[in-house]
């Protein structure tokens, strides 16, 4: 993502390079598995801390964990943005191979059907129009359809490209995102969800939505220009170090001048955290996360369905164990672990149904 030199790549050479090294892309599947588990644990903790509106609240006040908001804050800063980046990364090649008609059809099947079924079920159970965690699936579907529309009028870049990811380019990217997020949060603070114009059924949190759009777009560009493949070890390691330091800064917030500073400039602070920890994790998994065991292949195949199924399974489990004392942290870990296992296993069982794999 730097505006500088290295070896020259055209898009087709990038694709050829990537396809010759498909094993190297295992790290993206493995990273998505880890992100899915993190989402599940994030939601598991919401009932036991100040994590926003949740369908279940424990009857025992001793199960409340006041410290867990740090965990929520760090997660919210980057994990959905990283999901969008990874999703965007695979969009250009899928479109080029399938063409607009097949691309749109497959997205409507794989994203639209789960959205209608799970979103409809959540709405029925909540007694109001509500899609819960399926907002991500809906947004991803909208982004993909917009991409398909844009491609009808704009040809992809196919010239020589020597750009690569550097710390300076990440600083610029994070700065643009941060400034935009800062001004958005002046009128729409974090955790404020809306339906655009009050009627469009696309629930969004404006405070984070700019991040999601930018990360999806940067994923598309990263595929076009092989930015992930060309990211140097120095850039990757430094990005991870900066991202972890910024995450640690969230955990150190506990009143005082530092807390006041981060609170005042949180849109900018969070954006830098997002950009650096995302590219740092992408580098780390590229170098150390190409696990090719049957276990990881199995988990990767179920991770999408696990994201879809986990919420309702979790709420049922939380109500079922409400009267069982495990300690606050023990209950949080128990719910997270059991929900993760059940979600992945349920997806595996559903995928045994003929043609279900086209959706899940």
Model region roles, listed by residue range:
Residues 10-11, 15-360:
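Alpha-helical transmembrane segments and their immediate juxtamembrane cytosolic regions
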